[in-house]
């Protein structure tokens, strides 16, 4: 029977578990925070049986679970016996770092109903010592920024290829209908030869071979396409390094029916050949 990849994210309060779960979610994991340990096996079973297969699961489990958390070791033993494979990611930080983070966030420590903040941090560290010893991967976030933690998570659990970490949407549009509001990059191609003024091409779209041939018959189009794709391929690794997981490239002409459609389609083809995950969408292709 198919079983999904299961990562249990745990560790010290304030060490970055929430950000780790967000990073795993960006990598395509189905994430649930603060799930009672007794439900882990059942949850993994439900995910395995889901109509749309869930390949990767990340569960946040920590001391907030109170008495439920105490059952974690027995639960892990049980799922071992059931053949469910899992990894434990444990996040920690120095006492000084955790004290500073709690003071800056002004949020209470889960154990702060008694004792000073440093005392409860040390108490939690002591309670989690055995779980830390079971961890497959331990990350000390004391000197990490959020971006660095995200990069570390991606290096451990992400796909090995850079291309797979970013989903690119290429959208064609017409300037007369407005620029897509969620665009990251906008390019104006109204300087290219316009098929609209060719009677035989006017009623066609940039998806039709005749229109594409007309648009790309211009040396200017070919030169522009080379320079533009070189720019995109240069930018993508830098966007990924900054932690972007989605990129929308908007290509616009006057009405969004001919030139922008042809170029968006070509750009999508080029990026797919480089193994990038690409969706091509033509926003205004059916507008009159």
UniProtKB/Swiss-Prot annotation:
Keywords of the record: ATP-binding, GTP-binding, Nucleotide-binding
Binding site for ATP: 11-18
Lineage of producing organism: Bacteria, Bacillati, Bacillota, Clostridia, Eubacteriales
Functional description taken from the UniProt entry: Displays ATPase and GTPase activities.
The organism's place on the tree of life at top rank: Bacteria
Name of the protein: Nucleotide-binding protein PTH_2729
Protein family according to the UniProt entry: Belongs to the RapZ-like family.
Residues reported to bind GTP: 62-65
The organism of origin for this protein: Pelotomaculum thermopropionicum (strain DSM 13744 / JCM 10971 / SI)
Coiled-coil region list: none
GO MF, one annotated term: ATP binding
Record keyword Transcription regulation present: no
């Amino acid at each position: 029977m198919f079983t999904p990849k299961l990562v249990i994210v745990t560790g010290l309060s304030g060490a970055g578990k929430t950000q780790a779960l967000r990073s795993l979610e960006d990598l395509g994991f189905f994430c649930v925070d603060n799930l009672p340990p007794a439900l882990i096996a059942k949850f993994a079973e439900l995910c395995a049986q889901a109509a749309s297969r869930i390949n990767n699961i990340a569960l946040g489990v920590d001391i907030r679970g109170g008495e439920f958390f105490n059952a974690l070791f027995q639960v892990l033993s049980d799922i071992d016996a059931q053949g469910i494979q899992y990894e434990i990611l444990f996040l920690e930080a120095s006492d000084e770092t955790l004290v500073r983070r709690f003071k800056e966030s002004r949020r209470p420590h889960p154990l702060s109903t008694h004792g000073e903040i440093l005392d409860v941090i040390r108490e939690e560290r002591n309670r989690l010592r055995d779980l830390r010893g079971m961890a497959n991967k331990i990350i000390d976030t004391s000197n990490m920024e959020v971006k660095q933690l995200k990069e570390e998570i991606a290096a451990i659990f992400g796909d090995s290829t850079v291309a797979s970490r970013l989903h690119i949407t290429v959208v064609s549009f017409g300037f007369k209908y407005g620029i897509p509001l969620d665009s990251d990059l906008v390019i104006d191609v109204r300087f290219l030869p316009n098929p609209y003024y060719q009677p035989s091409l006017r009623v066609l779209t940039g998806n039709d071979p005749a229109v594409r041939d007309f648009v790309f018959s211009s040396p200017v189009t070919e030169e522009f396409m080379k320079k533009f794709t070189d720019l995109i391929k240069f930018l993508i690794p830098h966007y990924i390094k900054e932690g972007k997981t989605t990129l929308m490239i908007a290509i616009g002409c006057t009405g969004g029916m001919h030139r922008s459609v042809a170029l968006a389609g070509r750009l999508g083809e080029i990026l797919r050949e480089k193994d990038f995950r690409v969706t091509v969408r033509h926003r205004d292709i059916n507008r009159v």
